[in-house]
């Protein structure tokens, strides 16, 4: 009561407002005031002026009152409330059916319960009256007026004339029901009338259709527009049919279309399945099916249509196979066949394949329209599922390949030669098994000219065809087995070598052939075909870029290569090239000798990397990565940087986080760095960046500052000792590496958990900046597997390109990476010595992270990262010359260092050799696995202290990464603080 009275009061107040506008102070109420008024006793008294006829449930109902004032506004009878109307709906249905004027058969009862045209909106029992606001809905009256005018079916949705609209606005429920009955009756007569035109074949369909007409309003009326202006005029076909009367086939076809329209109008095609079947089965020339022969015109046996590869309907056994699988005869037409036309007229179920290769191609090509433009007759009906009639939109594969400048001559020319053989094999049932095909595909030669396009097709074929089965044979004489044809022609033309050839992409060097990921390749190829910027499949793109931007991975190769010459072949051009002995041990402390451990996983890596790949610019890489062409998992596998010792991290994390991080980083990374210049200072400079403080624990920051102070204090003039340390260092480092093998075992527990790493490692020997940065980020990013982290190499700060680390050592699951105590690249050592640092002092100085003040940093900075072998302590920023200030290292140095690490020899903690002495000492207790967290924290310090550096980490990493807490560390791992204290 209160509410309605309040409304009333408010209504009165507003009426007063209307009267008062002339007066200068009309009443204005705030919401609070009105609510307050509502609670007052006067508000609870019923004004005498309120007529009780507008009550609903004893409360005056303004809606009823309004309805009586503006009858057309929608309330059909002011006396009945909405609730009463809706309650009366169901009984009204039943009564209507019993109406003597109802000519429809008794099973209308079923119809009432069956889905109706408006089933989307209102369930089975909805009647027009339910939309109470529109119970005077245009449609019902329209049905009368317009029917009289043109005898048009209700579904045609003509715009209603105002006369019809206003007419009978006060109809009672019974009147409305009668109206509906009349409409239905008229519909029924209409249908009978049409049925008399000799359309005997549609009798069954008419019955169904008639049932579906219980509700005259098409669903889009009841669920859709509420005003005339919103009504869309959909012209009907019945008028035309009546006019054309006895025009035979033409009329029949149009009516078929109109029936379909009616079906869709009424029912969304739910109740009409049988009718559709009947129509489609009995009307072979129905325009709805545009045979796909339009797309793939048959050609004389001498010609070969490239698109035939993708037409599954030409594969003879396919239809029968599918029928066997589905257990259906070839006659049964799908009830949805009008939307999914089957180019092979056989009516076989092969059209029920989820999607044809053409469709797949279009989807990949992005050519698929959201709603495909309808074909010839599809304009006749509104279908939720786009019709198949869009022949013109099909992708012409041949055209695509031509656009991509793919040379098809060898393919096509070899076809005629193979034709007979293929025919025989297809008749005899000899078909490549999926495994064979896959094997063939894996070995595809990725030719720069051919650009994988042909392989892509093979791959695509394999995917689509193998879904059905390994039997792939073409039906027509002129068309050979799609698969055999493709594969054989490829083999014949040399596109598909029997033995996988070493592809020019680094991919094949890095990945064993079996690992070449199929998915990314196919996607990328498509991209290439479509003229996208990607120049190689993303996977190989990334890889080749990652590896390629490092001019030669001499370190990796030299470390692993069975023979020294190889490393020599790939000697880097970096300033430090002279330091590369053919067998320089890898920085990570894996001796070249005990390589057996590494051997298997890295076989892929042993393949020489072609310099060509080195040309890949990082931008391209970034593009590829950003475009997400390769699946994250594949990318991660392929691009995991192996020189990253910290990388014993489970692949899962890397794939999850790495891809995202890498992409962010890539998108932000500065112009591509030139990987070749490992010694150029510029890249180093570009690396300068700092970790945001939020990223670094306060204790670490404090330590950083303390150590910085300490460095400054300790800087003392150094003695110049021209050192011939280079060779000694190298030898010793090699020895150390050999001896360091045992150490790795400490890490084995963690690494064994990572069997997947081997693939990762295998996949990339080195990665350019994008990777690097990704790792720096990932290091932070990977808190979950703290145990797995290896302190050794903090990847250089994101900005730096990896200047071809000469010695990256991929992690191997079972060979933990050890970070030997002293690790300074011999070249660096030599320079330091040349600058007057006595070799004896190096270990202690380095351990403390301090170099004597006399040392000139410039040359050191110029050193490529590979030379600065200090893993833990980055070089201090150029401004503060101390050489290896542990925390304050500039990212630049970080990067440099990193590279150096990669190249440099890591000496096992215990080694007493001079190299050990010379190289920076990492506290020996840092277990190899402490890696990431530690590294990472280091990285943070280094970078974070580098707050002076212009480039902030934020530039490279998303805030999510920067704000993550440091990874938790297993007990074996030394925290940075401990590390510093021990020093």
From Swiss-Prot:
Single GO term (MF): mRNA binding
Positions of short motif Nuclear localization signal: 194-210
Known tissue expression: Highly expressed in developing oocytes.
Residue numbers spanned by region Interaction with PATL1: 694-712
Region described as Disordered: 1-22, 40-99, 206-229, 341-360, 585-616, 642-693, 708-800, 906-951
Residues recorded as bearing Phosphoserine in the entry: 4, 73, 77, 114, 119, 135, 137, 300, 344, 352, 373, 416, 563, 586, 692, 751, 919, 949
Listed Polar residues bias regions: 735-774, 910-928
Compositionally biased residues, Low complexity: 344-355
Sequence motif: YXXXXLphi motif, positions: 29-35
Localization: Cytoplasm; Nucleus; Nucleus, PML body; Nucleus speckle
One cellular component term from this protein's GO annotations in UniProt: nucleus
Modified residues (N6-acetyllysine): 485
Keyword Ubl conjugation: yes
GO biological process: miRNA-mediated gene silencing by inhibition of translation; mRNA stabilization; negative regulation of deadenylation-dependent decapping of nuclear-transcribed mRNA; negative regulation of neuron differentiation; negative regulation of translation; neuron differentiation; P-body assembly; positive regulation of nuclear-transcribed mRNA poly(A) tail shortening
Ranges of compositional bias, category Basic and acidic residues: 52-66, 81-99, 651-660, 724-734
InterPro entries: eIF4E-T (IPR018862)
Region (Interaction with DDX6): 218-239
Segments carrying motif Nuclear export signal: 437-446, 612-637
The organism's place on the tree of life at top rank: Eukaryota
Keyword Membrane recorded: no
Region (Interaction with LSM14A): 447-489, 938-983
Subunit structure: Interacts (via YXXXXLphi motif) with EIF4E. Interacts (via YXXXXLphi motif) with EIF4E2. Interacts with DDX6. Interacts with CSDE1/UNR. Interacts with CNOT1; promoting association with the CCR4-NOT complex. Interacts with LSM14A; promoting EIF4ENIF1 localization to P-bodies. Interacts with PATL1. Interacts with importin beta only in the presence of importin alpha, suggesting a direct interaction with importin alpha. Interacts with APOBEC3G in an RNA-dependent manner.
Notes concerning its domains: Intrinsically disordered protein with multiple low-complexity regions that confer binding to multiple RNA translation, deadenylation and decapping factors. The YXXXXLphi motif mediates interaction with eIF4E (EIF4E and EIF4E2).
Role of this protein: EIF4E-binding protein that regulates translation and stability of mRNAs in processing bodies (P-bodies). Plays a key role in P-bodies to coordinate the storage of translationally inactive mRNAs in the cytoplasm and prevent their degradation. Acts as a binding platform for multiple RNA-binding proteins: promotes deadenylation of mRNAs via its interaction with the CCR4-NOT complex, and blocks decapping via interaction with eIF4E (EIF4E and EIF4E2), thereby protecting deadenylated and repressed mRNAs from degradation.
Protein name: Eukaryotic translation initiation factor 4E transporter
């Amino acid at each position: 009561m209160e509410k309605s009275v309040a409304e009333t009061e408010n209504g009165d107040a507003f009426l007063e407002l209307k009267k008062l506008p002339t007066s200068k102070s009309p009443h204005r109420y705030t919401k609070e005031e009105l609510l307050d008024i509502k609670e007052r006793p006067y508000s609870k008294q019923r004004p005498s002026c309120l007529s009780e006829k507008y009550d609903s449930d004893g409360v005056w109902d303004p809606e009823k009152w309004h309805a009586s004032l503006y009858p057309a506004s929608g309330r059909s009878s002011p006396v009945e409330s909405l609730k009463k109307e809706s309650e009366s709906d169901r009984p009204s249905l039943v009564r209507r059916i019993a109406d003597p004027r109802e000519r429809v058969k008794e099973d209308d009862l079923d119809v009432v319960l069956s889905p109706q045209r408006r089933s989307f909106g209102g369930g089975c029992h909805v009647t027009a009256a339910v939309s109470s606001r529109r119970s005077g809905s245009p449609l019902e009256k329209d049905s009368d007026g317009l029917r009289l005018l043109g005898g048009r079916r209700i579904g045609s949705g003509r715009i209603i004339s105002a006369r019809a609209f206003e007419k009978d606005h006060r109809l009672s429920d019974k009147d409305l029901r009668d109206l509906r009955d009349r409409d239905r009756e008229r519909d029924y007569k209409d249908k009978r009338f049409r049925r008399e035109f000799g359309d005997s074949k549609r009798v069954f369909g008419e019955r169904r259709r008639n049932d579906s007409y219980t509700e005259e309003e098409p669903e889009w009326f009841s669920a859709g527009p509420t005003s005339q202006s919103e009504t869309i005029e959909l012209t009907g076909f019945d008028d035309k049919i009546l006019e054309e009367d006895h025009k035979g086939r033409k009329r029949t076809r149009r009516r078929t279309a109109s029936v379909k329209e009616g079906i869709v109008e009424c029912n969304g095609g739910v109740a009409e399945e049988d009718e559709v079947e009947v129509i489609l089965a009995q009307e072979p020339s129905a325009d709805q099916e545009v045979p796909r022969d339009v797309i793939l015109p048959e050609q004389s046996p001498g010609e070969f249509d490239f698109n035939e590869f993708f037409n599954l309907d030409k594969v003879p056994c396919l239809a029968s196979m599918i029928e066997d699988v589905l257990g259906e005869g070839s006659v049964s037409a799908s009830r949805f066949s009008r939307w999914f036309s089957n180019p092979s007229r056989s009516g076989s179920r092969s059209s029920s394949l989820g999607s044809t290769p053409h469709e797949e191609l279009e989807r990949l090509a992005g050519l698929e329209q959201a709603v495909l433009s309808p074909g010839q007759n599809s304009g006749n009906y509104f279908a939720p599922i786009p019709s198949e009639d869009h022949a013109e939109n099909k992708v012409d594969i041949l055209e695509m390949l031509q656009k991509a400048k793919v040379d098809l001559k060898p393919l096509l020319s070899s076809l005629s030669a193979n034709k007979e053989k293929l025919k025989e094999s297809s008749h005899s049932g000899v078909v490549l098994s999926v495994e064979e095909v896959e094997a063939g595909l894996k070995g595809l030669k990725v030719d720069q000219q051919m650009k994988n396009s042909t392989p892509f097709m093979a791959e695509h074929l394999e995917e689509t065809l193998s879904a059905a089965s390994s039997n792939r044979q073409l039906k027509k004489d002129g068309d050979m087995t799609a698969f055999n044809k493709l594969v054989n022609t490829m083999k014949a033309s040399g596109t598909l070598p029997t033995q996988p050839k070493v592809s020019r992409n680094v991919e094949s060097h890095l990945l064993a052939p079996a690992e070449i990921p199929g998915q990314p390749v196919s996607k990328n190829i498509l991209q290439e075909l479509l003229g996208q910027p990607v120049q190689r499949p993303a996977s190989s793109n990334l890889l080749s870029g990652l590896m390629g931007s490092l001019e030669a991975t001499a370190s990796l190769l030299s470390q692993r290569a069975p023979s020294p010459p190889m490393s020599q072949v790939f000697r880097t051009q970096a300033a430090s090239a002279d330091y590369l002995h053919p067998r320089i041990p890898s920085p990570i402390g894996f001796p070249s000798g005990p390589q057996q451990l590494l051997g298997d996983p890295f076989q892929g890596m042993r393949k020489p990397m072609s310099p060509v790949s080195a040309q890949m610019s990082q931008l391209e890489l970034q593009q590829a990565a950003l475009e997400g062409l390769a699946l994250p998992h594949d990318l991660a596998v392929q691009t995991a940087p192996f020189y990253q010792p910290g990388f014993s991290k489970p692949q899962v994390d890397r794939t999850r986080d790495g891809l995202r991080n890498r992409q962010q980083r890539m998108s932000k990374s500065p112009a591509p760095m030139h990987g070749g210049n490992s010694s150029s200072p510029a890249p180093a400079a570009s690396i300068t960046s700092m970790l945001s403080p939020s990223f670094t624990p306060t204790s670490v920051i404090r330590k950083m500052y303390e150590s910085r102070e300490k460095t400054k204090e300790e800087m003392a003039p150094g003695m110049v000792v021209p050192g011939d340390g280079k060779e000694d260092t190298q030898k010793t480092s090699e020895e150390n590496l050999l001896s360091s093998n045992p150490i790795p075992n400490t890490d084995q527990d963690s690494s064994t958990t990572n069997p997947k790493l081997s693939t990762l490692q295998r996949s990339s020997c080195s990665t350019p900046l994008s990777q690097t940065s990704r790792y720096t980020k990932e290091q932070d990013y990977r808190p979950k597997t703290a145990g797995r982290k290896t302190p050794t190499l903090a990847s250089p700060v994101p900005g730096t390109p990896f200047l071809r680390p000469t010695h990256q050592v991929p992690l191997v699951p079972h060979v933990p990476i050890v970070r030997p105590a002293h690790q300074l690249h011999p070249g660096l050592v030599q320079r330091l010595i040349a600058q007057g640092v006595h070799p004896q002092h190096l270990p202690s100085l380095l351990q403390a992270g301090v170099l004597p003040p006399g040392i000139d940093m410039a040359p050191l900075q110029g050193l490529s990262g590979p030379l600065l072998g200090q893993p833990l302590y980055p070089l201090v920023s150029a401004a503060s010359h101390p050489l290896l200030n542990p925390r304050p290292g500039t990212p630049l140095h970080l990067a440099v260092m990193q590279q150096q690490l990669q190249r440099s020899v890591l000496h096992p903690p215990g080694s007493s050799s001079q190299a050990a002495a010379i190289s920076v000492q990492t506290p020996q207790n840092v277990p190899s696995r402490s890696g990431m967290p530690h590294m990472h924290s280091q990285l943070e310090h280094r970078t974070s202290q580098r707050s002076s550096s212009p480039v902030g980490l934020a530039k490279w990493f998303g805030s999510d990464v920067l704000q993550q807490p440091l990874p938790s560390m297993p007990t074996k791992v030394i925290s940075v603080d401990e590390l510093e204290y021990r020093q």
